[in-house]
Amino acid sequence: MGELKCEVLPENFDQYDLSFKLIVIGDSGVGKSCLTMRATKEYFEEFYSPTVGFEFFTFNIKINNKCIKLQIWDTCGQEVYRSLISSFYRNSSLAIMVYSIDNENSFTNLENWLNDIKTQSNPDVKIFLIGNKTDLEDKRVIQYEQGELFSKDNKLDFFIESSAKTGLNAKTIFIEAAKLLYSEHLKYKDRASRPGSLADVLPVQKLDNEVNNVRQKKRCCGN
């Protein structure tokens, strides 16, 4: 297939050929929202209020002349919302698990988050692992090699460390996600085009209605 040519598009770009749903999960306080906001809005807020339930972000990118929209569901990590979050795994193409390099519990709890993905998502879901807050190097308790080993042992699709504060690898995470999902789309498409093949083409996911429905429910719950 050769090297993919990528160009990040503005957040408000609304014309796209493919759309994929991503879910960002992990313990509360690991920087999920800040990391996603840094990647999508190029903005960082030092004291960001914890996510209540969920938030939505969009990351747009052009790959080989195809415009791709990543619909990012940023979830809270608080136990009280765990049952609510479980419904968001449905139709997710990729899950991003985030831990903080200065928080041992957030790393230990990856086993629980991974189990949630495997039991509640579709069997073909891709999984990324992100070690966040590299700007807190002096407080590091989880070494890079530990994250790398966890990713390898569990056959995850991608591992990298990042910092929402400095912006390190924030966009890279979503660029790599888009590249992987686009490549998978081409594989499905090629498989389905072969004579006698029964393989399904990975569909363009129509997520806007799902987002609007969930937003409406969130507003109702907040009243």
Task: Give residue ranges: language-model regions.
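Conserved P-loop small GTPase signature centered on TRAFAC-class small GTPases
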Residues: 1-29, 33, 63-67, 123-223
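Switch I (effector-binding) loop of TRAFAC-class P-loop GTPase G-domains
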Residues: 40-67
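Conserved alpha-helical scaffold flanking the Walker A/P-loop in AAA+ ATPase domains
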Residues: 57, 82-87
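Conserved beta-strand segments of the P-loop GTPase G domain that flank and frequently precede/overlap
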Residues: 61, 72-73, 96-100, 128-132
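Conserved catalytic network of the ASCE P-loop NTPase/AAA+ motor domain
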Residues: 62-65, 86-91, 118-123
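Switch II (G3) loop of P-loop NTPases
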Residues: 68-83
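Conserved Switch II/interswitch segment of TRAFAC-class P-loop GTPases
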Residues: 92-111, 121-124, 134-141
